[in-house]
Design a protein with these regions (language model features):
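Periplasmic-binding protein-like
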Residues: 37-42, 67-69, 89-105, 124-126
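Juxtamembrane amphipathic/hinge helix adjacent to a transmembrane helix
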Residues: 173-176, 180-206
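Venus flytrap/periplasmic-binding-protein-like
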Residues: 1-4, 108-134
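Conserved HAMP-HisKA connector
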Residues: 242-252
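Alpha-helical transmembrane signal-anchor helices
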Residues: 200-244
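An alpha-beta-alpha
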Residues: 10-59, 168-180
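Short, hydrophobic alpha-helical segments
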Residues: 32, 151-162
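Short beta-strand elements at the ligand-binding edges of bilobed clamshell
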Residues: 6-23, 129-148
Length: 252
């Protein structure tokens, strides 16, 4: 394993983040209960192989009577050819893909985007890296949330908080995140399996929905301004009428 020789001081804390893809996989499968074939795709880098091993360990315990295929010895083009013609009721999992069989480097979001764009079946990842680029989403680790947590922790420490009092839990960085475009693609928009309060990205927001408060404020301002002008016109008319009557009275 990796052992850090970092020396901590009284203003430093360690944020321990535990990745548990098994929970992500289990939830993804619930979304597609008719699934009969499972494909775990991976690159050949050490981290790629680690995530493939984690997926394999879970599958060997929980998918005993299903068709499970592990792919880590293909280049990207061969993988794209594969996912274009997967059998019906298949699911694809891409835990990590940084290096293909031809030693061509990819970053995880790029790889999952390419695979998702060509796949005839739903594609899932284990984290928010690449979310919005093709994977459906699910119960995944959010590195964005980790970054936010670290930033907030730093502020607390600088304000005098005890570093040892700052702890991160699974709820701080795991969350339900879904891409609305993929939910529509796979007919999951109205699924009761999507937990309430989930984060939905790529929502189709109309101009009025996006700027309704601004539009409302402008309309309210125009209405009030119109009423004010109308009132001023009325007051001016009354003032002229009163002035005319005064003049007529004085001339008598």
């Amino acid at each position: 394993g990796f052992v850090s020789d970092m020396r901590l001081n009284d203003k430093t804390t360690i944020v321990n983040m535990k990745l548990d893809p098994s929970k992500s996989i289990a939830f993804d499968i619930k979304l597609f209960p008719e699934t009969s074939s499972f494909y775990f795709l991976s690159g050949i880098s050490p981290i790629d192989k680690l995530f493939l091993a984690i997926g394999r360990e879970w599958a060997e315990k929980n998918l005993l009577y299903k068709k499970v295929t592990y792919v880590s010895d293909l280049n990207m083009q061969e993988i794209l050819n594969l996912v274009r013609q997967l059998p019906k009721n298949s699911l694809v999992f891409v835990g990590s893909f940084n290096l293909d069989a031809d030693s061509v480097e990819y970053n995880n979001p790029e790889a999952i985007r390419l695979i998702s764009s060509q796949s005839n079946s739903p594609v899932f990842g284990y984290s928010d890296m690449g979310i919005g680029e093709g994977p459906v989403g699910g119960y995944i680790a959010s590195f964005a949330n980790v970054g936010l947590f670290v930033g907030q922790a730093a502020v607390k420490i600088l304000n005098g908080a005890d570093p040892n009092s700052i702890k991160i839990t699974e709820q701080d960085y795991y969350q339900y995140i879904f891409d609305l475009r993929e939910l529509k693609r796979w007919n999951l928009v109205n699924s009761e399996l999507i937990p309430a309060g989930s984060t939905i990205i790529n929502e189709d927001i109309s101009f009025l929905d996006r700027y309704k408060w601004i539009v409302g404020a402008v309309l309210l301002f125009l209405v009030l301004q119109t009423l004010l002008i109308a009132n001023l016109v009325r007051l001016n008319r009354n003032q002229k009428l009163m002035t005319r009557k005064v003049i007529e009275t004085e001339n008598r």
